[in-house]
Amino acid sequence: MKTIIAEKPSVAREIARIVGATKREEGYFEGGGYAVTWAFGHLVQLAMPDGYGVRGFVRDNLPIIPDTFTLVPRQVRTEKGYKPDSGVVSQIKVIKRLFDTSEHIIVATDAGREGELIFRYLYHYTGCTTPFVRLWISSLTDKAIREGLRKLEDGSKYDNLYLAAKARSESDWLVGINGTQALSIAAGHGTYSVGRVQTPTLAMVCERYWENRRFTPEAFWQLHIATDGCDGEIVKFSSSEKWKEKESAMELYNKVKEAGCATVTKAERKEKTEDTPLLYDLTTLQKEANTKHGFTAEQTLETAQKLYEKKLITYPRTGSRYIPEDVYAEIPKLLAFIGTQPEWKDKVRAKATPTRRSVDDGKVTDHHALLVTGEKPL
């Protein structure tokens, strides 16, 4: 039997349907020679300080730097401290049993740094030695999953990706735990959270806040003129220059007023070409969604993730705005598909030649730029 592990139940359900694992068991699907199970996010995490015998916020305990980090099931906070999440513990038992009884494991967690860490932490925590291979796909369409299953890659290919995620996880722990305890002890009033990302971000917000508070507006004078143009139109002009003193502005104003009319002495017309924008990565999608619709970054990611899980777009957490040649070859089909949708049919030119500006194999990272998949929305 082969075990496939996905990052969440909804993805496991899609993969199970494709491989014929139609029998539902507690914590997994089975059938067709496969067991398809799932995590729900990070089932395993780094232990909190009390897992190393360090309790409370005590100055003499700092810095807390474990010789070896300990992995534990995901914890929930209670009045008496942290304890393992019972649902997580149950799912880990299911996964361990499946891992230990399989000939090999197919890793189908999200194809990215955190998805790799979710599996590797589980793998190490359960003490598993079963060989594993990687399913690496950029969308959840049936076609993409089937192609991915035909082209499974050796798990060791992603060792460096795991090590990068592990370094991120451990650095977050070291900065967060030690920074929070040190600041809270020094301040002496409650708990002050410190984080590797959140604290520099908060500092930037505070810096902008104080820049705004310290800003002193200065009054200026500017010349605005409205004059009759051709065909009874009103033509308005504004001076590019601004004056701090009213007298300087009034001097020019009086000269214009005395002239009584304006004459166009020079007119230029220039033709400019503008490059089409690159395709979206997650960051540019979030920026545009915020500008046009007021979405927060989290709202955009959540919406994109749902569209991905419904097979409508490719992997949303991409950091690339480029696509490889083989994906570019599919773009005419995608444009034709979009043109069949009622709300878009007037916006897509028939047989349009797509631009190649976003085509560059060398600039594609783990995943290519965001694209629609060609699946029709329900």
Residue ranges of model-derived segments:
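Intrinsically disordered, low-complexity regulatory segments
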Residues: 1-169, 173-175, 179, 353-354
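Conserved short loop/turn motifs at secondary-structure junctions
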Residues: 1-3, 109-111, 188-191, 269-277, ...
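Generic recognition of stable, solvent-exposed alpha-helical segments in well-folded globular domains
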Residues: 6-10, 14, 90-93, 113, ...
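Generic beta-strand/beta-sheet core signal
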Residues: 7, 39, 108-110, 226-228, ...
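Conserved, well-folded catalytic cores of nucleic-acid-processing
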Residues: 18-22, 98, 105, 125-129, ...
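Long, highly charged, low-complexity internal segments
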Residues: 35, 43-84, 192-305, 309, ...
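Extended, highly charged linker/hinge segments and catalytic-adjacent loops that couple domains
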Residues: 158, 162-163, 174-176, 303, ...
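Short, solvent-exposed helix-loop connector elements
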Residues: 183-191, 376-378
